[in-house]
Amino acid sequence: MKATVDAGAFFKALNRVIPLLKVSAIPALSEASIQFRDGVCTITATDLELWVQTNIPAEGDDFGVVLSGTKSIAKAGKFFRGPLTFSCADAAVSSPQITMACADKSAEFTGYPLKDYPELPRFTCEQAYTANAAQLLICIGRIKYAAQRRSDSRPVMSGVRFYRQQLYCVDGQRLAVCANDAMTVDKTFVVPADAMWILKAFGDQNVSVQVGTRYVCFAAEGLCAYVRRLETCDTLTPEAAIPRSERESYVVDRKEFLQRLTYLKECASPVKTTPVVYFENGCLSLQTPSAWYRAAIELPGRSEVAFAFNLSYMWDALQQFSGHEKVRLHVLSPVSPVTITAEGTDDVALVLPVRYRAAA
């Protein structure tokens, strides 16, 4: 069996799926598969949560194999030009012998049969949208700090929610919302935040966003990424979490706030894993076993509501507004979430307060 593709197109396509490949207890999952069928070469990589496929034109017989040493093969690709031929005497045996040849260069290796590679689950589109991949990636990059790491007990907390004209992450202690005016979602869906790096593969292209029962497919120009959906919790919405009223709000200098938090973070006891900062009328204070450390930020007037917060959580929330000089803090009470906004953006950050002992 023999099939031929253009070397440049093949290795460009292979390099688009390689970032997904990781060391796996199942050897075949550490590699990419190639399948020639009906004049098309399909290259696939998966970690069983995320699937990436890309297609290029091909000529020759129909067969498929799983590569061995995929990353090394990709490195060799920079020396190949013109027609690239893959040949295999019997692709169905347990250790198929594969020859890759291009002009005066060739490589021989032992691969895996395609039956050892998991099949892409059937996909039926239920919702379809169009969005710019680069804009989605920027938006998710601003808010993914509020997603938990993967957890078997609360997987939904590790996701990015596509909700109406918003994307948001929530982990139970904080909420980060990014406006997504270019895409209005009819029915909320959630995908793992740590899988959204795959959008980099699309560059600045507009992508088709197809939502199925179990997967969401992002596709453009021969590249498809299937991301496993997480369960949806309809009660965890921005409307339900963000306070509808406030007792006071004030504008602060974002960089100044971050500088004061940096100082307090350096002063925190090394054994205190979650330093808590007490905020009262512009004064930030942090208690360690040996001392109280204080720093002040400028407020436009007097603040009446004192509250405390996790230093790291507030730090992350302020970083969400990295393009803004000023941010506005909205406060209702010492036990209500602190909401952060900025002029010129519909982004919202929310940080839950923590219990505190007032400074002496």
Predicted regions and their residues:
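Structural preference for solvent-exposed beta-strand-turn elements
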Residues: 1-360
